[in-house]
Amino acid sequence: MSESAIVGGGCFWCLEAIFQRVKGVHRVTSGYAGCRRQNPTYEQVCTGTTKCAEVVKIDFDPHIINYEELLHIFFAVHDPTQLNRQGADIGTQYRSVIFPLNEEQKAIAQKVIQKLNPYFENKIVTTIENPGTFYEAESYHQNYYNTHPDQGYCQVVIAPKLKKFMNMFQEYLQ
């Protein structure tokens, strides 16, 4: 049995690298959701005019890890209090967003945000949006960290987030 989750929180390379290491996750696909344009390209998304968010689609086994646990990881590995940015990545395409795929996921997302809000210094600004169509990103964006670990962005941005995840969530590591 497999379920899917779609979340965005900054550059999709970061979330992809993290969720690829989670026990019970079968596949992580970088892509775009929440778009007003069909079949957007990376270049179009980067303009900030498509309403797309850079996201990852996580295919997981709910008997091994559930949706709520995935959201707890999501909120721990990015800053959900930053509006339309993560670090130096600025624009609506980098917004903190959850795209629930059904009403149950929507209710869980609302519950998790309400539960975690008091633990952050600033208010969580993560939005819950209708995903519309999920568009898979170009092939050169897939499995990015694993194929480019020495690239500057990977070393400076992704590696520290990955280390934080591995320290905080050892019980969820594959």
UniProtKB/Swiss-Prot annotation:
Kindly give the InterPro entries that the UniProt entry links to this protein.
Met_Sox_Rdtase_MsrA_dom, Met_Sox_Rdtase_MsrA_sf
Family, per the entry?
Belongs to the MsrA Met sulfoxide reductase family.
Tagged with keyword ATP-binding? no
What is this protein for, i.e. what is its function?
Answer: Has an important function as a repair enzyme for proteins that have been inactivated by oxidation. Catalyzes the reversible oxidation-reduction of methionine sulfoxide in proteins to methionine.
Give the enzyme's EC designation: 1.8.4.11
Could you tell me what this protein is called? Peptide methionine sulfoxide reductase MsrA
Which reaction(s) does the protein catalyse, per the Swiss-Prot or TrEMBL entry? Answer: L-methionyl-[protein] + [thioredoxin]-disulfide + H2O = L-methionyl-(S)-S-oxide-[protein] + [thioredoxin]-dithiol; [thioredoxin]-disulfide + L-methionine + H2O = L-methionine (S)-S-oxide + [thioredoxin]-dithiol
> What EC class does the entry list?
oxidoreductase
Alphabetized GO MF terms: L-methionine:thioredoxin-disulfide S-oxidoreductase activity; peptide-methionine (S)-S-oxide reductase activity
- Give GO terms for biological process: protein modification process
Q: Mind listing the UniProt keywords for this protein, alphabetically?
A: Oxidoreductase
- Catalytic residue positions: C11
Record Pfam families: PMSR
